[in-house]
């Protein structure tokens, strides 16, 4: 695994924090599906086994990369699709 891939995986595992249940305004069609938040790049939703979206938050300096389905460095993501990054 490349250093970049390992770093991305580490960022996802360590810094993605389950903050609370949420509603992204979208429905889950299958479990383990990921949805981006339309108003905040720091937030994404993971669909649980009951097809309910669970609000997750990326760590500092990262945002949700919907193409790769990981929290990624802000320079690597298109934040126009996922809204603004929350102030730190």
UniProtKB/Swiss-Prot annotation:
Provide the Chitin-binding type-2 domain boundaries.
25-81
Where in the sequence is the signal peptide annotated? 1-16
Q: What organism, scientifically named, is this protein from?
A: Thereuopoda longicornis (Long-legged centipede)
Name the cystine pairs: 58-71
Give the main localization category.
Answer: secreted
Q: Which InterPro entries match?
A: Chitin-bd_dom, Chitin-bd_dom_sf
What is this protein's tissue specificity according to the annotation? Expressed by the venom gland.
An example of a Gene Ontology cellular component annotation for this protein is: extracellular region
User: Which top-rank group of organisms is this from?
Assistant: Eukaryota
Its localization reads: Secreted
Tell me which Pfam families the record gives: CBM_14 (PF01607)
Gene3D superfamilies cross-referenced by the UniProt entry: Chitin binding domain (2.170.140.10)
Name the family the entry cites: Belongs to the scoloptoxin-01 family.
Which PROSITE patterns does this chain map to? Answer: CHIT_BIND_II (PS50940)
Q: Name one GO molecular function term.
A: chitin binding
Q: Which UniProt keywords apply?
A: Chitin-binding, Disulfide bond, Secreted, Signal, Toxin
Q: How is it modified after translation?
A: Contains 3 disulfide bonds.
What is the protein's name according to its record?
U-scoloptoxin(01)-Tl1a
